[in-house]
């Protein structure tokens, strides 16, 4: 159950924000500001409290579709659109912050970026991140989107762009639509295949990451010396 922190009595959320800053407000108060109004029978703070109590974490709010938002009592079409826009804006701010650091320093850094990009996609997406000698991103490219006939990309598709971009290294990332990030036998076989192909061309495969909505698996972190 989501934990609610009660607001300070005597001050409305907007007044608290003006006097003390947004960072001191509870999630309930911030949500109440976004919702703006309640209903005839329920205050906006009470509505925000009820919505949050129905969630296991604040992240659940970002996963609700427009239709699911509208099914929440008191949340009509306009409020659901405003909430969806707020969530999308928050995602884009997070992505912009991550993008400021052009140099890739860790698998976790890439995983955070890619969980936002493809972690909740209903189809499998395979993304290649091409890097220069300083591990700076040259280009991030979606190489493959899963379909009925195929569920994984071929190394040649990934390495074609690596050669074209003159990348010295790359990171391969794909999502599991199930949300689970543990590798399947096919994932392991594919990683072996792409690693051999990279070695043949003198390109370093820095990692293969599998991401879900809120978790990831790194072949480099989980397998000693990246030996598969």
Swiss-Prot record:
The keyword Zinc applies. PROSITE patterns: MPN, UPF0758. A motif (JAMM motif) lies at residues 174-187. Residues 103-225 form the MPN domain. CDD domains: MPN_DUF2466. The keyword Thylakoid does not apply. One of its GO terms (biological process) is proteolysis. InterPro entries: MPN, RadC_JAB, RuvA_2-like, UPF0758, UPF0758_CS, UPF0758_N. One of its GO terms (molecular function) is metal ion binding. SUPFAM superfamilies: JAB1/MPN domain, RuvA domain 2-like. Pfam families: RadC, UPF0758_N. Keywords: Hydrolase, Metal-binding, Metalloprotease, Protease, Zinc. Zn(2+) binds at residues 174, 176, 187. Belongs to the UPF0758 family. This is UPF0758 protein str1465. It comes from Streptococcus thermophilus (strain CNRZ 1066).
């Amino acid at each position: 159950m989501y934990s609610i922190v009660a607001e300070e009595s005597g001050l409305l959320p907007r007044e608290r924000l003006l006097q003390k800053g947004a960072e001191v407000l509870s999630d309930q108060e911030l949500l109440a500001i976004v919702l703006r109004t309640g209903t005839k029978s329920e205050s906006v703070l009470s509505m925000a409290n009820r919505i949050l109590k129905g969630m296991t974490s604040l992240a659940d709010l970002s996963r609700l579709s427009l239709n699911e938002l509208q099914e929440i009592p008191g949340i009509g079409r306009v409020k659901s659109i405003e909430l969806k826009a707020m969530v999308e804006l928050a995602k884009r701010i997070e992505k912009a912050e991550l993008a400021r650091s052009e140099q890739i320093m860790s698998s976790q850094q890439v995983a955070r970026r890619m969980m936002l990009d493809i972690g909740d996609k209903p189809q499998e997406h395979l993304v290649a991140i091409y890097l220069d000698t300083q591990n700076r991103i040259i280009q991030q490219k979606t190489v493959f989107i899963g379909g009925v006939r195929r569920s994984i990309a071929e190394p040649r598709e990934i390495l074609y762009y690596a050669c074209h971009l003159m990348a010295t290294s790359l990171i391969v990332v794909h999502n599991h639509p199930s949300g689970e990030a543990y590798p399947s036998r096919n994932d392991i076989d594919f990683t072996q295949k792409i690693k051999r192909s990279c070695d043949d061309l003198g390109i370093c495969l820095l990692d293969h990451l599998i991401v879900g909505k809120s978790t990831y698996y790194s072949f480099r972190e989980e397998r000693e010396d990246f030996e598969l």
